[in-house]
A protein has these predicted regions:
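Ubiquitin-like/PB1-type beta-grasp interaction modules and other compact soluble beta-rich domains
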Residues: 1-87
């Protein structure tokens, strides 16, 4: 179930760029989506807080570089989230 994005924009934020089916968790993707973060939160914790199932995220890039989900987020970071792709 999709969790609503937090409404408060008073604290530190990151910009999330969801791709593919992941846009359903963020409402849009064009230009990125500012999302508040808590100090010291990891990418895995951030995704869990928003209700994004781990299996729906294939690749994560922070500030243009592929990273693991145990990476800590900092205010101002840019986070790219890519869904798995299937085709034939």
């Amino acid at each position: 179930m999709t969790q609503p994005l937090p409404e408060s924009q008073n604290g530190p934020t990151i910009t999330v760029h969801p791709h593919g089916e992941l846009t359903t968790y963020f409402g849009r993707s064009y230009g990125g989506v500012p999302v508040p973060i808590e100090p010291g939160i990891t990418i895995a914790g951030f995704l869990e807080r928003l209700g994004v199932p781990s299996k729906e995220v294939w690749l994560v890039a922070k500030n243009g570089e592929q990273v693991k989900r145990d990476e800590t987020l900092q205010p101002g970071d840019s986070l790219e989230l890519f869904a798995p792709v299937a085709g034939g």
